[in-house]
């Protein structure tokens, strides 16, 4: 059995200064023995990092949920993780372009883990 928990909260400094929470997470249970979880930390100095972190966490986990199954090899799973980062980056780039913003206003980190049975696959960018 896999149990998960996650929360992204606005800290006291952010509340005091009227700054939105720039951190995001997403957890997707793919099957009884497969879960994908992402954490993205938006760069505090960038105006749209909250949007970028949300897109990154959501898109990466959704991509994994749509493509990972138990019967894949380790190499295939790692390839899907890598692709999920690329897809998330593309979505962030599209968001910036759609809003006529500079891409560097959308900076975020992304950590992604996929647990399948007793095997953990992990990727990080940022």
Model-derived features with residue positions:
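PP2C/PPM-type serine/threonine phosphatase catalytic domain
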Residues: 1-126
């Amino acid at each position: 059995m896999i149990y998960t928990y996650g929360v992204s909260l606005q800290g006291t400094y952010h509340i005091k200064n009227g700054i939105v929470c720039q951190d995001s997470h997403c957890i997707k249970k793919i099957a009884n023995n497969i879960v994908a979880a992402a954490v993205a930390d938006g760069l505090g100095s960038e105006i749209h990092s909250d949007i970028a972190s949300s897109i990154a966490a959501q898109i990466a986990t959704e991509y994994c949920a749509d493509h990972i199954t138990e019967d894949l090899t380790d190499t295939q799973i790692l390839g899907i993780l890598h692709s999920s980062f690329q897809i998330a980056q593309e979505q962030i780039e599209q968001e910036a372009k759609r809003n006529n913003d500079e891409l560097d206003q959308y900076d975020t980190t992304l950590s992604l883990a996929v647990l399948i049975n007793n095997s953990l696959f992990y990727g990080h960018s940022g």
